[in-house]
């Protein structure tokens, strides 16, 4: 499944996981992507939308 929002384009953030002994390994923080049925151009369509776009009302559910 895609980890990019179809509305705002938000994608994963990258960084390091740091243990107590300060060993560092690469990791990624994925946005909270939900599959939402919405009306685009008069036809219902499934979009991958982040939770912040759903909360902000940028997407109307079908």
UniProtKB/Swiss-Prot annotation:
Tell me the keywords, alphabetical order. Ribonucleoprotein, Ribosomal protein
Q: Which Pfam families match?
A: Ribosomal_L28
GO terms (BP aspect): translation
Ribonucleoprotein as UniProt keyword: yes
This protein's source sits in the domain of life called Bacteria
**HAMAP family in UniProt:** Ribosomal_bL28 (MF_00373)
This protein's name = Large ribosomal subunit protein bL28
Output the lineage of the source organism.
Answer: Bacteria, Bacillati, Actinomycetota, Actinomycetes, Frankiales
């Amino acid at each position: 499944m895609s980890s990019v929002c179809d509305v705002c384009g938000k994608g994963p953030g990258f960084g390091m996981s740091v243990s107590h002994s300060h060993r560092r390994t690469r990791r990624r923080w994925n946005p909270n992507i939900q599959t939402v049925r919405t009306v685009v151009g008069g036809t219902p369509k499934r979009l991958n939308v982040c939770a912040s776009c759903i909360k902000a009302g940028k997407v109307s559910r079908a």
